[in-house]
A protein has these predicted regions:
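Basic/polar N-terminal segments that are highly enriched at the extreme N-terminus
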Residues: 1-10, 134-135
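Short helix-adjacent coil turns
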Residues: 19, 26-27
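Short, surface-exposed beta-strand-loop junctions and turns on beta-sheet-rich folds
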Residues: 49, 94-95, 129
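A short, polar/proline- and glycine-enriched secondary-structure boundary/capping micro-motif
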Residues: 98-101, 133-135
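Short beta-strand edge/turn micro-motifs at domain boundaries
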Residues: 107-134
Length: 135
């Protein structure tokens, strides 16, 4: 993990922690608090083109198939791209009610692109894909 900018690293970790706390609470509004207005999200079969589209999609999910779920995220690295941009890579998964662990086939690798705007770190883009493990 890049630790040469401890204040920025702490702020980015805070963005990700807040994001997952909102997930665990099933709160779509809080989920997108740290997303840029023009943020994009790409996941298998999904392409969201704004913070509002992300919020709507999560609200629908939290009201149905994601209800009561929790998310885990194991942050791997943060790499800075100049003063106001960073890429974070993590391994994440969704734990559904009654599960104690996320099954390996539901784990994903996630890429977070963050931009510092007006002194605050915001999610500019998010992408995940299945974490395929060699047999």
């Amino acid at each position: 993990m890049t630790e040469t900018r401890p204040h920025d690293v702490a702020a980015i970790k805070g963005v990700l922690e807040s994001h997952y706390q909102a997930w665990d609470a099933g709160d779509a509004d809080a989920f997108v608090t740290d997303y840029a207005q023009d943020a994009t999200v790409i996941m298998p079969g999904i392409y969201r083109k704004s913070r509002e589209e992300v919020r709507q999609g999560m609200a629908e999910g939290f009201a149905s198939f994601l209800k009561g779920s929790t998310a885990i995220d194991n942050l791997g690295t943060i790499r800075f791209l100049g003063e106001n941009a960073a890429v974070a890579v993590s391994e994440a998964g969704i734990r559904f009610p009654g599960e104690t662990e996320v099954p390996a086939d539901r784990m994903v690798y996630a890429t977070w692109v963050l931009e510092k705007r007006d002194g605050a770190w915001r999610v500019a883009a998010y992408h995940n894909s299945p974490a395929v493990r060699p047999s």
